[in-house]
Amino acid sequence: DPEQWWQATDRAMKALGDQHSLLDVKALGIAGQMHGATLLDAQQRVLRPAILWNDGRCAQECTLLEARVPQSRVITGNLMMPGFTAPKLLWVQRHEPEIFRQIDKVLLPKDYLRLRMTGAFASDMSDAAGTMWLDVAKRDWSDDMLQACHLSRDQMPALYEGSEITGALLPEVAKAWGMATVPVVAGGGDNAAGAVGVGMVDANQAMLSLGTSGVYFAVSEGFLSKPESAVHSFCHALPQRWHL
């Protein structure tokens, strides 16, 4: 339930404010788990529980999407997998059509929190690359991939580089957290943001991240892909950087 994410964020920020003054904070960035599908109607209401990255219900939809867009691996740089967002939406279209018809916006988990913080529909390149709707080389939405899921650009968030400002903290949120209406930057998917945090920002740098999933993360200055190997190819959370 995305509302529980927001309630947890609100509690955490208030608890932090009880320990330290947040008035000196100059900006906020957001990072979070990737690939999850958060579906909103035209009134910004959540339509159903989010379908998270580790939900494997949409294997058939992966096959269908690659058949509909034969160039999908070239566009996205990736082999279509059930963990990605696009096949999840095609599953909803096929199995929950009454829900699908009401979709006004599709957001990734961290970007739902951004909406609640700023009122803005926005995402960063690294997280968007994990949807399978992004042309990863061009760092832009792919109309072909969206149309294959019966979706359009209007239902997608605006795209930003990870270091760009996507909006400002809403006055009511800032007041509740004891903060100024500071800028909120795009941020990144969990692994891309973690890579920036430990200095993995230049070509040929690499790291190993172990957690709920295991990730070997290698930075490049250009788009590289080998989808037949099932190695992910995504945008990094910084401009003009990609990663495998």
Locate predicted features.
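Residue-level signal for inorganic ion chemistry
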Residues: D1, L28, D55, V92, ...
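Phosphate-binding loop and its immediate beta->loop->alpha context
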Residues: D1-H20, A50, N54-N78, G83
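N-terminal glycine/serine-rich phosphate-binding loop of ATP-dependent small-molecule kinases
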Residues: D1-R48, Q102, P157, A174-A186
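A generic secondary-structure signal
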Residues: A12-Q19, W91, H95, V198
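Glycine-rich beta-strand-to-loop/alpha-helix junction loops that act as flexible
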Residues: A31-H35, G162-E164, L210-S213
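Glycine-rich phosphate-binding loop of actin/hexokinase-like ATP-binding domains
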Residues: A37-L65, Q102-I103, L107-S142, V185-L244
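Acidic/polar active-site rim loop that often engages polyanionic ligands
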Residues: L40-R45, E66-I75, L89-R94, Q240
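Gly/Ser/Thr-rich active-site cleft segment
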Residues: S72-G189
